[in-house]
């Protein structure tokens, strides 16, 4: 297996033994993850795919060496330094109406090709896009448990955030996203807004989880932010 010096630095590969491990990771990535389930707050179980140290180190190198120049869309509030769930909720305080939507199977829906194209769109070289998309995906999706998955999800979703922000602006609404949770608020939310959002998501191979769609009519204040947080996310 031959990779250039730039990739050696990006991946933190410096020895033949490490290069051999990388070859095995690319050939059979599932063998480098430990899977277990955790209970969801809403019921059911979530599968966590935790990389073994040999893969986790390479993914950590990618995260530290590749993603620092990339910025998430301003409407993204999860996995962004200096932002948190309270900031996400604060955007929507004082909104008379609020619509909360959930993206179904968010991380698993982000395919290797989506990762490749997102990196390419942000100026990464073809070989970087190729190897990163291989190393950071599992079963053609982002593994929940890999340190690179959050940053990649924001990178992939950035063009959609732009579309959804434009849709919100058209109706005079505010929009923000916390991971797979989308929130729209304002004086009046059109009845077909959820359908319009769903149509945009479908263009990018994402789907709404309609069971989690929630609409609220209420005037919020800043002092209610913590209570409101439970509703938004």
Regions found by a protein language model. Give the residues of each.
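Short, conserved non-catalytic motifs in the polymerase core
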Residues: 36-59, 77-81, 100, 134-153
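Conserved polymerase palm-domain catalytic core
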Residues: 91-179, 183-228
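Conserved, surface-exposed functional patches that form binding/active-site neighborhoods
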Residues: 230-233
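An N-terminal domain-start capping segment
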Residues: 1-12, 83, 120-131
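Active-site-proximal segment of RNA-dependent polymerases
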Residues: 55-101, 105
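Short amphipathic beta-strand starts and helix->beta connectors
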Residues: 31-33, 84-85, 166-171
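N-terminal low-complexity, intrinsically disordered segments
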Residues: 10-19, 65-66, 70-73, 104, ...
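Non-catalytic, polymerase-adjacent accessory regions of viral genome-replication enzymes
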Residues: 1-37
């Amino acid at each position: 297996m031959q990779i250039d010096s730039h990739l050696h630095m990006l991946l933190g590969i410096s020895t033949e033994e490490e290069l051999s491990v990388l070859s095995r990771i690319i050939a059979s990535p599932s063998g480098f993850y430990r899977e277990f389930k955790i209970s969801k707050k809403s019921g059911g179980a979530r599968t966590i795919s935790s990389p073994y140290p040999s893969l986790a180190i390479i993914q950590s190198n990618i995260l530290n060496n590749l993603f620092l120049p990339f910025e998430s869309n301003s409407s993204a509030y999860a996995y962004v330094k200096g932002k948190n769930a309270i900031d996400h909720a604060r955007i929507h305080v004082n909104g008379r109406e609020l619509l909360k939507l959930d993206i179904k199977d968010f991380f698993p829906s982000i395919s290797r090709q989506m990762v490749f194209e997102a990196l390419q769109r942000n100026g990464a070289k073809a070989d970087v896009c190729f190897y990163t998309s291989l190393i950071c995906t599992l079963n053609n999706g982002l593994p929940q448990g890999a340190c690179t998955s959050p940053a990649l999800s924001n990178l992939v979703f950035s063009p959609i955030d732009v579309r959804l922000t434009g849709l919100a602006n058209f109706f005079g609404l505010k929009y923000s996203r916390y991971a797979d949770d989308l929130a729209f608020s304002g004086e009046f939310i059109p009845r077909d807004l959820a359908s319009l959002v769903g149509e945009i998501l479908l263009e990018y191979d994402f789907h709404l989880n309609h069971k989690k769609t929630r609409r609220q009519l209420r005037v919020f204040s800043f002092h209610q932010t913590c209570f409101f947080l439970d509703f938004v996310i």
